[in-house]
Amino acid sequence: TSGYFSESIQNLEQIDSRTLNDATRIEYYAAYEWAYSMWAEYSNDKVYAPRYYEKEMLYQDSLISVLPTGSSLHNYWKGENLYRHQRYSEAEKYYQKALEGVPVNVRLYAMVTYGLALVYSKLGDWNEYEHYLIKAAISDQVCPLKENLALQELALYIFKNRSGEVSRANRYLNYSMEDAQFYNNRLRMLEIAKKFPSIVLSYQ
């Protein structure tokens, strides 16, 4: 998220996956998937982003193939894959399975609940969308990783739908920016910069 995507890929290319044990191979494919996903999001164009997304999906398929079937991680990534293929109702089922027994202070909880929020937004269920965004935002705070994507989305949702709560939306977004700056998370800072002006202007 600091912008060193090509360097990350180059480092991964130095690894011979045939020498990895099962657990390390999971981390290997997950790192590739994440790097290409973030690179595509960072590029946000019509030339390079589609190429990176294609690579991301290839490594996502590889990751799913090596995860233990029925595990929380396997169900989560199946949900992600189905979501990306616009099979939202099926994605919801896998996300819900992935959430079973996962405590709020585990990173996977935030990932799954954020995925569920996105699914419900596609299904037009805005109450559930907000419900799971809040769950994801709470988990982000419990896990000290300085990741506040859910809080950003919640701020924007409040701004657009709660005319009397602009100050709360502004507070959430400011908090997200502080965390992004703390970790020099350029991707999140760019995202916030796009949303930030309209909320700040409304608040002033």
Residue map of PLM features:
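A "functional boundary" signal
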Residues: 1-203
